Amino acid sequence: LPIRPCRLPSDPWHAAATGTTFEKDHPFPVPEPHVLVPLILVALAGGGPTPAASSSPALSMPADTLTAIYRAGVSFQDFLGAAEARKVDWEATWAGAGLDGAMVERALQAGEGWRILAVAEDWCSDSVSSVPYIARLVEELPGVELRVVTSGPGAWVMEQYRSPDGRGTTPTVLLLDPSGAEVGCWIEQPSSLQEWWLAPPAPEETNRDRMQRKMAWYAEDAGRQTVQEMVEMLEGAAAGSPVCPAH
C-alpha cells in the first residue's frame, strides 16, 4: 500500500512546519456545521449508528455529545469485519495480539463502567498497529466497552485532541466515564515511538525509510507499550487524575 500519513488532510499547520503535502486519496470528511446538530440529536435519541460530531472544543465537550459519537461507533469485531484496506494486517495483528497478565490485573483494578472511543481508519498504519491490542485488552475487562468510529463521525474529536505537533490523527482514543465525560486520551502512537517520529529526520532519511523503521518498531514492541499506556490511562481515571497529553 502507498505510504499515507494518518492525519487530517486539511491541517495547514503541519504542512507549513514540515514542508509536506497531504494525501488526497483518503480525505477525512469533516461535517459542515449545519449538519452537526441534527446528527447529534439523532444519535442521542437512540437512532442507531448514525455519524455524529460537535463543533465544541473536546476539552469542554458535553458528555452527551461524546456519548452520541460513541453510540455512532461499532464494535471492534464489526470494524474488523468491514475493513478493506490492510485487511491481512488487521487480521494478523488481531490474531497475534497477546497480553501481559500483569497488565490485565492492573487494568482490572481500575474497575468497571469505562467506555473507550477509538477514532481509526483501516488504511492507517498506526491504527492497525495499535487498535487490535486495545481491543484485546478490553476483551479481558468485564464492564469495559470499546467502540470504533471512522474519521467522519470522529472528525471533531480528532480536531480537538491533536498530536503534540498539532495534527489531527488516527488513531485518537478517548476514555469516557459512565456519565460520558472524557477522563483520558491517547493520541496516535505510543509515547516513545512518537518522540522519535516527531523529531527532525536525519538528512539522508527518506519518508519510506522512516515508515519502514516505524513499522519495525511496532513489530518488535508487539503492542506492549500501547497496552501499558491504556492501563495507565485507566488507572489515572480511577484515581481521579486523567492522563491526556492534549490537556
Where do the PLM segments sit?
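Non-globular targeting/processing and membrane-anchoring segments
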Residues: P49-E112, Q160-G166, V183-H247
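Thioredoxin-like thiol-disulfide oxidoreductase module
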Residues: V148-P171, L176, W197-P201
